Amino acid sequence: MPRADQSVDVAIIGAGPAGLTAAYLLTKQGYSVTVIEKDPTYVGGISRTVEMDGFRFDIGGHRFFSKSQQVVDLWNEILPDDFIQRPRMSRIYYEGKFYSYPLRAFEALWNLGILRSTLCMASFAKAKLFPNRNVRSFQDWTVNAFGHKLFSIFFKTYTEKVWGMPCDEMSADWAAQRIKGLSLWGAVVDGLKRSLGLNKKPNDGMETKTLLETFRYPRLGPGMMWEAARDFVVAGGNQVLMAHSFKQLAQDQGTGRWRMVADGPDGDVIINAAHVISSAPMRELAGRIHPLPATLPEAMDLKYRDFLTVALMVKGDDIFPDNWIYIHDSKVQVGRIQNFRSWSPEMVPDTSIACVGLEYFCFEGDGLWSSADADLIALAT
């Protein structure tokens, strides 16, 4: 039998960054809130930090950066004393060579060689003189911006790994958003300055995101931010129910209130709420609202790209100094490799052990997603 109704102002589906930010702000305003999270242990969603024997592993490590002062202020409020400033070092691995990312002009020219560098510049000139006027795809946009040769070297392979589809089938809008503010000329000028040691601009959050030299990071990984947000919500008298999966959502047409059912370890829990905030995938949400929405077929057709991280603990020094390395090699499936100590030294407490995370992009249910742990470890090593 379902447990007795919990009556709250707001019910929230998912204890990831979106759900916990909403819960945090609502708790500050004095609202009653219940959050449900299907993971039995960790909050933070894709931004969680997994712990084993004192070692910490980020599922999807990314630097903390925002041009919104409101967002930065919120981060500082949740974690007032736990951000550290880290030097950014990331590289691209392509055809057996490493390229600094963002590019360093002299290094890139040397690695590519005179012939290929000349072809890249000729390709760029051609794109500027004869641009594609009918830009529809990621490939169209990127070729127009950088030329076909640079597109094929530094964009095509990695992007297709991430999204699992050809670049000429991806929207140009995504390219404009993801690579906004970055041009070949800007990258070359910035690369020249850094190659000569002349780039001394402070990391004030107002430079092009792709060119940032340093970044802020929670000292124990991003998961500690969402753990702190959860603790604040609970300390404020609200609930974060772990190991509770979203099951059903229906609205009372008379009162306008919502009846949400969650499946927990001890059976169903019913939450009665004036409002509901969902951070669940749209397919899951649409399929569990009753009555079913008219747009259900469209919602169920939405596709999501999934990924998994294979974390390895290796005896010895760090394998590389970078925060992460992009693998632009179509011969291997891995897309990015993280160095957890380079994110924060406190995440790897034993200096005799190196910890890396190999990221693989896949679709839920495909061969990679369904692989046994032993097979994934073998693939990663």
Could you say what each language-model-derived stretch is?
Residues 51, 58, 93, 241, ...:
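A general beta-strand register signal
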Residues 70-101, 145-152, 232-240, 247-258:
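Feature captures the FAD/FMN-dependent oxidoreductase FAD-binding
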Residues 53-130, 140, 177-180:
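Dinucleotide-binding Rossmann-like beta1-alpha1 core, especially the glycine-rich loop
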Residues 18, 41, 283:
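Conserved Rossmann-like nucleotide-cofactor binding loop
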Residues 27-50:
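Glycine-rich FAD pyrophosphate-binding loop
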Residues 119-122, 126-250, 256:
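Active-site/ligand-binding neighborhood in enzyme catalytic cores
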Residues 5-6, 29, 244-372:
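Mid-domain catalytic core of redox enzymes
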Residues 8-35:
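N-terminal Rossmann-like FAD-binding beta1-loop-alpha1 element of flavoenzymes
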